[in-house]
């Protein structure tokens, strides 16, 4: 039943509410972080944070593509590998390599603690979503990958906010 509902392209009231809440949470977290960081470092953190949250959050769906089977129609799927199979280790490692420049920039600009907080937040978010998807759907679809990316974007922002507000933790 869940897969049938996900095929419907219309957006329901819960979908709208989830999008609005996610957007408002991002705005609040960004405003909080930038309010703390901008007086000290100027606009540079805003640019780095905007790029970091996009780059780092896009690695998590690759983990789902590697670990979960696709449960939708394979013929119309855009989430399967070009070869028509799950993402292999080579694809996952390639994705990890593409995230390394951002990790290096965060290391240089931030600290190892910031990277650790982001890694923990994204790992826990992805692991919990993966468990839920495996139990609920038996795998993943393209919608699940989009949700994973958005949740991990929020996780990156939350980790940065925790780091900026409580740098000792």
Where are these regions (language model features)?
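Aspartate-rich (DDxxD/NDxxD/DxxxD) Mg2+/diphosphate-binding motifs
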Residues: 1-15
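Hydrophobic alpha-helical transmembrane segments
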Residues: 14-140, 144-169
């Amino acid at each position: 039943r869940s897969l049938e509902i996900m095929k419907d392209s219309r957006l329901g009231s819960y979908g709208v509410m989830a999008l609005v809440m996610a957007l408002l949470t991002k705005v609040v977290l960004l405003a909080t972080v930038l309010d703390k960081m901008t007086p000290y470092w100027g606009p540079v953190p805003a640019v780095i944070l905007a790029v970091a949250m996009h780059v780092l959050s896009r690695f998590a769906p690759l983990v789902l593509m590697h670990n979960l089977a696709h449960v939708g129609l394979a013929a119309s799927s855009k989430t399967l590998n070009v070869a028509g199979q799950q993402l292999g280790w080579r694809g996952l490692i390639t994705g990890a390599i593409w995230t390394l420049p951002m990790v290096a920039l965060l290391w240089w600009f931030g600290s190892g603690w910031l990277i650790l907080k982001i890694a923990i937040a994204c790992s826990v978010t992805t692991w919990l979503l993966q468990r839920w998807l495996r139990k609920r759907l038996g795998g993943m679809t393209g919608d699940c990958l989009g949700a994973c990316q958005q949740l991990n974007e929020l996780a990156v922002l939350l980790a940065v906010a925790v780091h900026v507000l409580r740098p000792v933790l």
